[in-house]
Amino acid sequence: MTTLFVLDVPENIPVVDVAGTDPSVTIGKIGPYFEITSDGTIVIDRRATGCRHAVWYSCLAGIADARIVQHDKDALRLEPP
């Protein structure tokens, strides 16, 4: 399962909210982190989050069973390995 971890701080909430709009994505919590999971690809559009670049590039705390195929000014895309 493709998994993305995002620290639970106010600046990162829009990232989690946008990820959660995909019906194939599940949002959970592990300690101080949001756990964003999907059986397939996870795509988060930066402009939809409203995040500035500094927050956008620092929101990624970790991944599991995934590989990052895009992390630029437009989107974050994780795919299963």
Short names for language-model regions:
Residues 30-33, 39-81:
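Helix-rich interaction surfaces within compact, conserved domain-sized segments
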Residues 22-26, 55:
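A common structural junction motif
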Residues 1-2, 33-34:
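Short low-complexity stretches enriched in small and charged residues
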Residues 2-11:
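Short, surface-exposed ligand-recognition loops at beta-strand->loop->(often short) alpha-helix junctions
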Residues 5, 27-30:
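Short, conserved beta-strand edge motifs with alternating hydrophobic and charged residues
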